[in-house]
Amino acid sequence: MSSDPGSPGPGSPPSASPAAPASSPASHLGHAPGTGPEPLARLAPLALGALGIVYGDIGTSPLYALRDCFSGAHGIAPTPANVLGVLSLVFWSLIIVISVKYLAFVMRADNRGEGGILSLLALVVQRGGGERSAARRPLLLALGLFGASLLYGESIITPAVSVLSAVEGLGVATPLFAPYVVPIALVILLALFLVQRHGTGGIGRVFGPLMAAYFLTIAVLGVRELVGNPSVLRAVSPVHAVSFFAQNGWHGFLVLGAVLLVVTGGEALYADMGHFGARPIRFAWFGLVLPALLLNYFGQGALLLRNPGVASNPFYYMAPQWALYPLVGLATAAAVIASQALISGAYSLTRQAIQLGYSPRMEVVHTSAEERGQIYLPGVNVALLVGVVLVVLGFRSSANLTAAYGLAVTGTMAITTCLAYVVARERWGVRRAIALPVAGLFLAVDLSYFGATVVKVAHGGWLPLTLGVVLFTLMTTWKRGRELLGQKLRAASLRIEDLLESFGDNGPQRVPGTAIFMTGNPEAAPTALLHNLKHNKVLHEQTVLLSIATEDVPHVPAAERVTVESLPLGLRRVTARYGFMEDPSIPDILKRCREAGLPFNVMSTSFFLGRETLIPSKKPGMALWREVLFVWMSRNSRAATAFFRIPPNRVVELGAQIEL
């Protein structure tokens, strides 16, 4: 786009506003602002919808969590004491991590109703908190970006491990299916990614009822076993968890790396808060999901007490023989739904990264005219598909993948705790004496899980770490490259007021029509305007300087979208503001300008864009290899005309070479 300081081109989104307002106090109470407590008639449908989007990931954990505790790479013998100890860890993990940490505390840290690690990061990096806070901001920014990078790894691993673990039930039904598990899983995953371009609006309506049926089914399976051995419920006492570590020592600590699989998906509860609100998500958790999960886990424990030989797959061995194939079908459907949630989450995360300036522009396709949140990013879809296929072919089974899965999850959980603590202190004003012990407890749990998975780096944990480092490097390189480019452009810029004053009262010759000059810095004269004056020596009758800024909030109210200012010589300065969950659109901006009294005739309007040709150099600022990477990312970014929906036949591009 424009070659001005902070401009969104080439290949960048609009510049993020550094001083957006903090989320409203009302939003800290657990619902999106303005919604208030939902009546039951509205709460139930929202909770059902949340079942189909939010709880797919955590809902499929019973397929493999206890299996890995007792038969994984670091599995422990399924003795009665060990079974009770593991069940106690499972119970308290679900209570402390999901029920208390995420649902009671983290979900209060919403950014005007939106959740997720980038929304949380946007709250953290907003100006405020004094010099000490500003000094910590780079570290917090790095933490948040690495957490987001790990989520991309989870978006690759979740579809692979969920679908593989579901299809592996066929091997329990009959060993004849064992050689076909990987091919069947690949076919299902390929179909899942191929339908993404068509959107999931139609089939999405059945996700909620399907997941409700799934949770009821696994609850019934658990009850069948508990009726025969209710003594397993003693594991609710934390004494069994303490005894488990006391008796097993280091081995018991390693098993904690498998126990954490029961809380995978916790981040999804927070990330999807903007779709449903906090209260429906909590209602679904305490009303159905938590009871169903606990009944199933304790049912698996009862089965293991009765028959330790089924440790290789206790979930499927709970089912009677006649129900195995239907259960495999239902579990596969749940795995697909869990995968869809992570894929959609990757799309949303990428759009946020683009708008906040951490990623170059990409094609964003809206798959629903009614739901603005239903988007499809072809580039991300292809990358995820390639990653998932390679992971399935490389690891071959869900048991081999869970080590990789755990590291991605625990890293993000720990980072979320740190960022939420900063928000509590600096945004809410919570005293350190209160915030620190609470955050310290959560962080101690998170780091315990993380420590138990770090030792598995050689067994698959290297995968999310590698993906995280690669994506972190890409995002920070893009951000730093844009900052360096902005600095160079600012040094060569000219204030628009100074330029106009230099013409005196008459100014250059005017020609009919309207010219819109895109700029990222509303105070500076766009380079495209300077080139036009230098070579053509004319101004259009109506000349507009348009800048598009992204605020650190998810949505900008319509009344605050566009501001119009008058400049000397009849020029106008238009500033359009968007949230990081919104897509900038030139047609939308022109419509709002007309409403503000600034008419446009698109057929007589020309859009002047600057296009920079970037040249890597050995000058100070960024390593040469990162400059080369930044130039490559810039060249492969989506064209500004397509990203901002500018009529391509009305665009004039003026280029310039810039040495980094």
How would you describe each model-predicted region?
Residues S2-L660:
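The structured alpha-helical core of multi-pass membrane proteins
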